[in-house]
């Protein structure tokens, strides 16, 4: 078998894989049009906010829909025109999977075990789509630590899956919505955790705070900093 030697500098060329999360109404879906040449997989039916962007999308209502969409993205000639895939949202997909498992399995613990296995495989499959940027959005989970601090992280059904989710991605970005000193609402992507908000980036090219423009962020990661 021939060994194929690659260089780490070309990793971004295979696509940047991002998980972003935030509160309802933060504008996670509005990040999709900022991706290079995107197609959306909508499991939430919440694309009205980007209606004017006229983004192509595939409606996901069942696991069969998701599996069919994956095979189309992986194998079809038509999918090659899209540089980015957005799955909105992975939290909602997990809820669909869990409901299906609970219908099939009376043992709740076994159902959650199947959920973890199914979602791990699904996330890896979409994350590893070659030559495509991949964005997955997630809901926000708030928890409290032993010191009484409120912690923020991406949310999934089941404690185990919630804890595993960030490890699948090189980039985990909360979409923050805050008021500035003058009372104006500001939206920004956070790329580094502060002990309260879970965030991470494998790239040294990003600032702690970035504008909510994933195309610009991807260019920075790929060494095309403007």
Where do the language-model regions lie?
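Conserved P-loop
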Residues: 2-87, 91-96
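Short, well-ordered beta-strand core segments
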Residues: 38-40, 134, 172-174
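P-loop NTPase motor core
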Residues: 84, 89-164
């Amino acid at each position: 078998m021939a060994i194929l030697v690659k260089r780490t500098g070309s990793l971004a060329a295979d696509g940047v894989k991002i998980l972003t999360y935030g509160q309802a109404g933060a504008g996670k879906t509005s990040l999709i049009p900022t991706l290079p040449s995107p197609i959306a997989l909508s499991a939430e039916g919440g694309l009205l906010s980007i209606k004017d962007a006229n983004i192509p999308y595939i409606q996901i209502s069942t696991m069969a829909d998701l599996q069919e969409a994956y095979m189309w993205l992986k194998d079809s000639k038509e999918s090659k025109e899209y540089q980015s895939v957005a799955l909105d949202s992975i939290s909602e997909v997990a809820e669909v999977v869990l409901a299906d498992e609970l219908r099939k399995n009376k043992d709740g613990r076994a159902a959650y075990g199947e959920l973890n296995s199914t979602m791990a495989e699904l996330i890896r499959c979409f994350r590893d789509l070659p030559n495509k940027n991949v964005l997955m959005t997630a809901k926000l989970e708030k928890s409290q630590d032993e010191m009484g601090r409120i912690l923020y992280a991406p949310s999934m059904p089941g404690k185990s899956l919630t804890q595993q989710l960030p490890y699948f991605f090189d980039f985990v970005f909360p979409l923050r919505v805050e008021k500035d000193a003058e009372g104006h609402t500001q939206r920004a992507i956070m790329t580094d955790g502060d002990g309260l908000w879970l965030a991470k980036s494998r790239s040294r090219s990003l600032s702690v705070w970035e504008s909510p423009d994933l195309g610009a962020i991807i260019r920075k990661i790929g060494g095309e900093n403007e």
